Amino acid sequence: MRSLSSIALLSVVGAASAQAGPWAQCGGKSFSGSSECASGWKCQELNEWFSQCVPGAESTTPTVSSTPTPTDAPSVSITASATTGINKSISVSSASKSTPLPSSSSASPSPRPTGSGSFAKADGLQFSIDGETKYFAGTNAYWLPFQMNDADIDSVFDHLEQAGLKILRVWGFNDVNTAPSPGTVYFQLHDKEKSTSTINTGKDGLQRLDYVVAAAEKHGVKLIIPFVNSWDDYGGYNAYVKAYGGSKTEWFTNEKIQSVYQAYIKAVVSRYRDSPAIFAWELGNEPRCSGCSTDVIHGWATKISAYIKSLDPNHMVALGDEGMGLTIGSDQSYPYGTSEGNDFEKNLAIPDIDFGTLHLYTTDWGIKDNAWGNGWVENHAKACKAAGKPCLFEEYGMKGNHCTDELKWQKTSLSSGTAADLIWQYGQQLSTGESPKDAYSIFYGTDEWKCAVMDHMENVNKN
């Protein structure tokens, strides 16, 4: 997607001055605060920039690198704000309140999901899920981890399982710069005044994602979880920039920002690396670096994908991009170009990137003929075949008319050699009313649901 309207969601816990409080920073380069944690908590180093008080029996002082560093080195805390991709304006509902996340060796604020099933994997040009290698279909519901009502989450997974949709993409980020009102879900707070970040692992934080992962395990659905948004919705790059300086184009190479970003990745991956519900980790939602050399995103993606694999070698990793910068079949139009800093084929060749992703929004890209999308899908399938990796048709949609040209894109995806498709986006009635929606939403049980989902699933099952 392009940029969505967003509602920042926050709430933070303050730290004491004499001792660092629960989840507070207690060490790191250029950190001048207390390195002693409150009783029952210990100081654990997450990276050279940031050590955090996590549950533990004793207080310890972290080791700090003596390498010279800038005087404005970051301190990390995590908050929430929303972000997605396309030019879609959507209403966003709130979630809950919480605390930062401990490392995988520390006690977790809520039980980690441990369900049955096996890890999804790439199998040639296809995906294998729970031992079955075939074409799969799924959807996007970015808003699901921000729901506070467990029954709403269960209902969504009930409907997905009934429909046979095996893959669901949800936001694994929600970055904020200001604490939201109580009862609003956020995952990471980037304090602009203190240049610190805090991870929220409380009931209105990552514990909501915990429930989503557990529900996915129960229903046999696999999740794709991106770590940051290119767009300002739900925080995005700008939430980091507001706290640490620089610009969106500098986000990829800013040492302080990347340290905070990697600390968040470690917190989330460590939480779910043993879960069979994770289909793949994504570096971000629609990464873009406008006007940059394609080397910027390529270098960043090479480094971060390797880092994720070092934390979790069992799950797949993808970039989460739109598929821009493709030479195969190029008509020199905007999406085929590299103005947004992406080179699809170069990025796909990164060793730790397991599959390619492509998105499709003709209206948002200034394409007047929807039939253009068929070639877009086919050309990416050719690029993936050349690379020997699967292609995921990860986001696609139209503003209305979901039962016309959109169905042709689905048929092209089935016949061209892509491995799966995820329609944008799923909607249904929740306890609070309609789920967050945009012009692309397809609501459960409607006529559009039948044509765009149920009829498509019949074709998928015949494939």
Swiss-Prot record:
PROSITE patterns: CBM1_1, CBM1_2
Region of interest: Catalytic: 119-463
Residues bearing attached sugar chains per UniProt: 87
Gene Ontology CC entries for this record: extracellular region
Gene Ontology molecular function terms on file: cellulose binding; mannan endo-1,4-beta-mannosidase activity
Known EC number: 3.2.1.78
Pfam families linked: CBM_1, Cellulase
Annotated catalytic residues: 286 (proton donor), 395 (nucleophile)
Subcellular location: Secreted
Keyword Lipid metabolism included in the entry's annotation: no
Residues the record lists as binding substrate: 171, 285, 361, 424
Residue ranges of domain CBM1 in the record: 19-54
Signal peptide residue numbers: 1-18
Region (Ser-rich linker): 75-118
Source organism, top-level taxon: Eukaryota
Stretch list, region Disordered: 57-78, 93-121
Keywords attached to this entry: Carbohydrate metabolism, Glycoprotein, Glycosidase, Hydrolase, Secreted, Signal
GO biological process, one term: mannan catabolic process
Compositionally biased tracts (Low complexity): 59-77, 93-118
Record remark: domains: Has a modular structure: a carbohydrate-binding module (CBM) at the N-terminus, a linker rich in serines, and a C-terminal endo-1,4-mannanase catalytic module. The genes for catalytic modules and CBMs seem to have evolved separately and have been linked by gene fusion.
Role: Endo-1,4-mannanase, a crucial enzyme for depolymerization of seed galactomannans and wood galactoglucomannans.
Homology family: Belongs to the glycosyl hydrolase 5 (cellulase A) family.
UniProt protein name: Probable mannan endo-1,4-beta-mannosidase F
